[in-house]
Amino acid sequence: MTDGLRRIAMVSMHTSPADLPGRGDAGGMNVSILALASALAARGVEVDLLTRADREPVDRELAEGVSLRTLAAGPPTPIPKGRLVDVADEFGEAVATLVGRRAPRYDLLHAHYWLSGLATLPVAIELGLPFVQSFHTLAAMKNRALGEGDTPEPEGRLRGEGFLVTQADAIVAGSSAEVTTLIDDLRASPDRLWVIPPGVDTELFSPRRARNDTAVREHLGLELDRPLLVMAGRIQPLKDQELAVRILAQVHASRGWAPLLVIAGEASDDSYRDRLERIATDLGVESDVRFVGALDRETLADLFAVAELTLMTSHSETFGLVALESAASGTPVIGFRGTGLVDSISDGESGVLVATRDAFDWAAVVVSLLGDAPRLARLGASARGYAEGFTWATAAASLLAVYENLVRS
């Protein structure tokens, strides 16, 4: 147990850290929270993960030293993320009740995402507890890079994030792109800003899983003899799976055949998936696109390991944890340079960063790599080495230093 720090609460109001990434509002943030909590617990700090109950509240232990606590706020049903601000005060009151006003059970509160901060900051102020804020995504970043069909983030979120930046005892960012936005757009004070990149589970995501190639392909209904391009994440305009379909069509046009594009994740809006299917049909590659849904972590790790390349076509990424997971699996990543992927993809080492959003430019990279097996193998090996430099133990140690500094002061 560390000096002065026994138990902390991480708050994720809008999505449970235990939810499956790629489904609903779950993504890299969920993975990061749970992994950090487990790594902190391994260092002797008990961690409670607090989330809103979207069904009957049930508390459970997720790992040794890590417990999930679901708190009632609003009806016990899913509420669209855009309307959760209406129950933020009620959720905050539930947090205060759990923490205990007379003798707080936690040494520190760490809010993840702006809604959690909005609900939790008043509790921290009332009880005199140190307050840490992680945003994971920022409205200003998203609004600068909207995809076709995307809805701009509301003014209320912009104001809320700006307010939290002025009030938090510490702000933890995951990438240089996030830091730039925090300082330039939200006027964050650099002396309260910490940059802690996420880690990756290199035991789970490993090239060793490639030996399961046939079983993985059969399980997912994929042909045994075709190269695979993978996209993993929620199916939504922000992630721009449409660009991936257009890249596939461009590869087909230049080579006369196409690899399989495997899209792992669920649609935030069915109309967008319908649009993707129409575009694939119009471009003549409908038989080359597979939607496999949101995958559990083991199956996703298998898919990355047997794939040739991973595509990350998002308009906006704060960091892009998927890039590390793919790299750890020995699979290079092609990503858009104009995002936080500049921190998660090492150009020429773990993948290739593309400067444009032109499908022709992306397809040229895909064709070049698929047509040069030795180069692809070298890039896969160096990608694994790059990913090994990002560990959850290191991230947790850095985060613990932030916590201990606040508790001591």
Place the predicted regions along the sequence by residue.
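Short hydrophobic beta-strand element within catalytic cores of glycosyltransferases
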Residues: 332-335
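N-terminal subdomain of nucleotide-sugar transferases
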Residues: 1-66, 70
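Aromatic "clamp/platform" in nucleotide-sugar-dependent glycosyltransferases that forms part
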Residues: 315
